[in-house]
């Protein structure tokens, strides 16, 4: 599977400083019934996803959201590492597992914070 364009639009939404433009990125990236689940939130639909983006942007003003790995994919699933940084300092890092629908839109995002724990 090629690197899906929808992932780039989703990332662009997190980095968009103009709130009036966030929705356009999300509509190019997300399925209408998108689910976003990470340790801090669970959202359903584009409206809730957009509200979460705005909430996180307000909580970490000036943050830069970036992928820190390539995108590994099979079937309709993608995984990649990411980080949030501000003024050159990493604020949070983690990884996402993203499911796409048949049209290549993001259907589900499962986010995890921090590195994986050590094995037993």
What residues fall within each predicted segment?
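Hydrophobic pocket/interface hotspot
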Residues: 10, 22-26, 34, 49, ...
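Short beta-strand segments that buttress and anchor functional surface loops
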Residues: 79-87
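Short glycine/serine/proline-enriched coil/turn segments at secondary-structure junctions
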Residues: 74, 87-90
């Amino acid at each position: 599977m090629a690197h899906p364009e929808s992932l780039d639009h989703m990332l662009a939404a997190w980095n968009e400083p103009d709130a009036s433009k966030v929705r356009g990125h999300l509509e190019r990236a997300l399925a209408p019934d998108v689910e976003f689940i990470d340790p801090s939130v669970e959202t359903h639909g584009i409206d809730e996803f957009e509200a979460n983006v705005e909430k996180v942007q307000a909580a970490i003003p000036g943050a830069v959201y970036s992928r820190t790995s390539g995108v590994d994919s099979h079937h309709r699933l993608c995984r990649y590492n990411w980080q949030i940084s501000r003024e050159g300092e990493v604020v949070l890092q983690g990884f996402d597992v993203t499911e796409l629908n048949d049209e290549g839109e993001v259907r589900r995002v499962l986010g995890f914070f921090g590195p994986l724990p050590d094995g037993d």
